[in-house]
């Protein structure tokens, strides 16, 4: 839909092309849904994964986070950094207890086909974000399965890093404004999903703006 009269089709097209490139790069990696193809002018379809998000009880079975760690290792080995591992809702627990990682909109992939120094900059960014992926993985493990933690994982889960702390401080005003805007829109009934009847309405990540305005 247009925003302030400006067409935004190019944003949808960019997001679709970006995720397609990432999914194709990760084809065959265990725990990554399969790319199925484009749908319509801007849409696309991926493999349906039957499972529940990590932020839904009960806790995952023993060994879940070790398997998840191997998935992230495989993703990183393909030159892709996930970039959204802080959201538990992006990590699914399949009926057999195995992990799946979904939603690659924020993923960054290495671009060896780009000229230097662009490929060097992107490569450094991929390396940094991959490190943040491991930080969030270990943080989730510490909070959900602390008895399975190793000493190294414990250290990683506590190491936010200077850039991470700076990012949190700089974006705090934006997050507050965004949360207030979403809360107001939700109260006015403007954030109703077209697939609401098909959704699991236990969605903890949305509770910060689903609360009623004081």
Question: Where are these predicted regions, by residue range?
Answer:
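Short glycine/proline- and charge-enriched loop/turn segments
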Residues: 2-7, 52-54, 115-123
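Residue-level recognition of conserved beta-strand positions in structured domain cores
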Residues: 1-2, 37, 47-48, 103-104
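C-lobe/activation-segment region of protein kinase-like
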Residues: 94-210
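Short beta-strand micro-motifs within the conserved protein kinase catalytic domain, predominantly
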Residues: 33-43
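Short, electropositive alpha-helical surface patch
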Residues: 23, 50-55, 158-166
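ATP-binding glycine-rich loop module of kinase domains
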Residues: 1-24
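Conserved kinase catalytic-core helix
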Residues: 19-32, 52-105, 134, 140
């Amino acid at each position: 839909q247009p925003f302030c009269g400006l067409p935004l089709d190019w944003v949808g097209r960019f997001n679709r092309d970006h995720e397609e490139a990432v999914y194709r790069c990760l084809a065959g990696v265990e725990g990554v849904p399969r790319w199925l193809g484009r749908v319509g002018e801007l849409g696309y379809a991926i493999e349906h994964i039957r499972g529940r998000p990590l932020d839904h009880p009960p806790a995952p079975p023993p060994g879940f986070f070790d398997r998840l760690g191997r998935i992230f290792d495989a993703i990183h080995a393909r030159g892709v950094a996930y970039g959204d591992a802080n959201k538990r809702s992006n990590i699914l627990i399949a009926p057999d207890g195995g992990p799946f990682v979904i939603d690659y909109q924020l993923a960054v992939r290495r671009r060896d086909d780009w000229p230097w120094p662009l490929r060097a900059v992107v490569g450094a960014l991929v390396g940094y974000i991959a490190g943040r992926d491991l930080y969030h993985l270990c943080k989730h493990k510490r909070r959900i399965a602390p008895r399975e933690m190793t000493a190294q994982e414990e250290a990683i889960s506590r190491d936010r890093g200077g850039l991470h702390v700076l990012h949190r401080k700089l974006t705090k005003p934006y997050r507050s404004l965004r949360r207030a805007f979403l809360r107001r829109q939700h109260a006015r009934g403007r954030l109703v999903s077209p697939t609401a009847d098909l959704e699991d309405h236990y969605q903890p990540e949305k509770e910060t703006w689903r609360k009623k305005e004081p």
